[in-house]
Amino acid sequence: MSQKLKTTYQETIVPKLKEQFGYTNIHQVPKVIKITVNRGLGEASQNAKALESSKAELSTITGQQPVVTRAKKAIAGFKIREGMPVGVMVTLRGDRMYAFLDRLINLALPRIRDFRGISGNSFDGRGNYSLGIREQLIFPEIEYDKIDQIRGMDISIITTAKNDEEGRALLKEMGMPFR
């Protein structure tokens, strides 16, 4: 697996952020803890094939088996009962997380049509970043002929940053293409 981003973080990003924010200890420097990739499927309760294809796509993209998320409450308007499958999600940590982030930044995001950079407004106030993707075709692992329907996904990058400024600086140094 590609360790390029991890070594870049340890060798160049940590000293740069330590100097920029005036940290005394390297453990104060913000780092990425985990990345969650989530896909909500409204039709999963009626269509089991959509759930299986989504599981296969997410495991191809992330390299890890996704878990099926189930409805916590029954919602009559959406024809959902408690315990019905409503989506799939993957939590990435460690080496897989760095490999996925590297592929996302360098391969997937530049393949988005009319891409001019991602919004810098999607931070949550605690240094975590959320990103919505409209189609799975931007990942080179997905073959156009094999997909049954274009579906998006939500990607959340959870960091140890104390505020949005630190989180933005960390992701910018990692190469995240902000506008």
Curated annotation (Swiss-Prot):
It holds the Pfam family Ribosomal_L5_C. Keywords: Ribonucleoprotein, Ribosomal protein, RNA-binding, rRNA-binding, tRNA-binding. This is one of the proteins that bind and probably mediate the attachment of the 5S RNA into the large ribosomal subunit, where it forms part of the central protuberance. In the 70S ribosome it contacts protein S13 of the 30S subunit (bridge B1b), connecting the 2 subunits; this bridge is implicated in subunit movement. Contacts the P site tRNA; the 5S rRNA and some of its associated proteins might help stabilize positioning of ribosome-bound tRNAs. HAMAP family: Ribosomal_uL5_B. GO terms for molecular function: rRNA binding; structural constituent of ribosome; tRNA binding. Belongs to the universal ribosomal protein uL5 family. Part of the 50S ribosomal subunit; part of the 5S rRNA/L5/L18/L25 subcomplex. Contacts the 5S rRNA and the P site tRNA. Forms a bridge to the 30S subunit in the 70S ribosome. PANTHER family: 60S RIBOSOMAL PROTEIN L11-RELATED. GO terms for cellular component: ribonucleoprotein complex; ribosome. This is Large ribosomal subunit protein uL5. GO terms for biological process: translation. NCBIfam families: PRK00010.1 (NF000585). It comes from Microcystis aeruginosa (strain NIES-843 / IAM M-2473). It comes from the Bacteria.
